[in-house]
Amino acid sequence: MTAPTTRKDLMIVNMGPQHPSMHGVLRLIVTLDGEDVVDCEPILGYLHRGMEKIAENRTIIQYLPYVTRWDYLATMFTEAITINGPEQLGNIQVPKRASYIRVIMLELSRIASHLLWLGPFMADIGAQTPFFYIFRERELIYDLFEAATGMRMMHNFFRIGGVAADLPYGWINKCLDFCDYFLTGVAEYQKLITRNPLFLERVEGVGIIGGDEALNWGLSGPMLRASGIEWDLRKVDHYESYDEFDWQVQWQREGDSLARYLVRISEMTESIKIIQQALEGIPGGPYENLEIRRFDRLKDPEWNAFEYRFISKKPSPTFELSKQELYVRVEAPKGELGIFLIGDQSVFPWRWKIRPPGFINLQILPQLVKRMKLADIMTILGSIDIIMGEVDR
């Protein structure tokens, strides 16, 4: 009788691009030794649409509808970065009311993004209930967005010098009611998930990143803060009106998937804190800076002459980008979202380089999944929080 032989060959498995846990068209070529991951190679580019090249032959106002297609779950941040760059190049002052409205919208968008991270992340590791729960709160946020901007997603709401429209009557009270309700929702999530032994078994000690390692890989956002680095661009860069509110940077030391979950859950309650303060202290005044004289134009142009530039909804395509370069960044839900902008005394940018947080955070995935089990790939990938529209651009 022949003795049974055990095969020692490695197995190569394709995960994606059509896979429910890939969060978009990501493809992983995984090399397995039984259940153990030997190697993992991400294949990107299935959703590449040439966003940087498109920007080079569009005015800023023409390009705004495109940018909401990068990270389509946190569109306010892509709009914010698109108008912050030209505002800094043109030295344009934003009215205080507009700045407060922007902060409110950005933080609501952060909560919506974190909610739609939490649901699929829990579904990936086998918990279906939170996946359905998160849509209750997310729908309420989208109702607020629809009332203020006219759109549930892809809002096209930010403008150079302010926002497209003022908050409608009764919106502030509606938003305050949502804030009170949402805090009970977060408490429910924590009760349901945080101490659940099955959940802890799947995430504790999985995908550990040390602080130095996170810095060396260029990680940002919750990925960096979960590794013990207290770094948040809202505190560091002092953009918009974040300095006027009382809030804390949320961070953890452990650097594993559980730490990344805890950072994002805590960030949602901090965002509510910021929104409540902004709603209660929102000043009066204009919501858009309509009359900006260009500083590099003639000294006293005629009122209706071509040199007098309005930076507003209607004539803003004539807004020229001065001949200088600038890197501008915001703290998006997934990390540091930045653009490197070069103006050329033209209405079109000469170069528009996008720094997407998801793309850079994803680079550490092969290192994290090596020597882990096949099932841990979903946990680790889910904890990174990627959107392929932003990764591929």
UniProtKB/Swiss-Prot annotation:
| UniProt superkingdom | Eukaryota
Q: Which GO terms describe its molecular function?
A: NAD binding; oxidoreductase activity, acting on NAD(P)H, quinone or similar compound as acceptor; quinone binding
Question: Which organism does this record belong to?
Answer: Nicotiana tomentosiformis (Tobacco)
Q: State a GO cellular component annotated for this protein.
A: chloroplast thylakoid membrane
What protein name applies here? NAD(P)H-quinone oxidoreductase subunit H, chloroplastic
Which family, according to the similarity comment?
Answer: Belongs to the complex I 49 kDa subunit family.
Record-linked Pfam families = Complex1_49kDa (PF00346)
Q: Which GO terms describe its biological process?
A: photosynthesis, light reaction
Q: PROSITE patterns of this UniProt entry? A: COMPLEX1_49K (PS00535)
In this UniProt entry, which cysteines form S-S bonds?
Answer: none
Q: Which gene encodes it?
A: ndhH
- Quaternary context: NDH is composed of at least 16 different subunits, 5 of which are encoded in the nucleus.
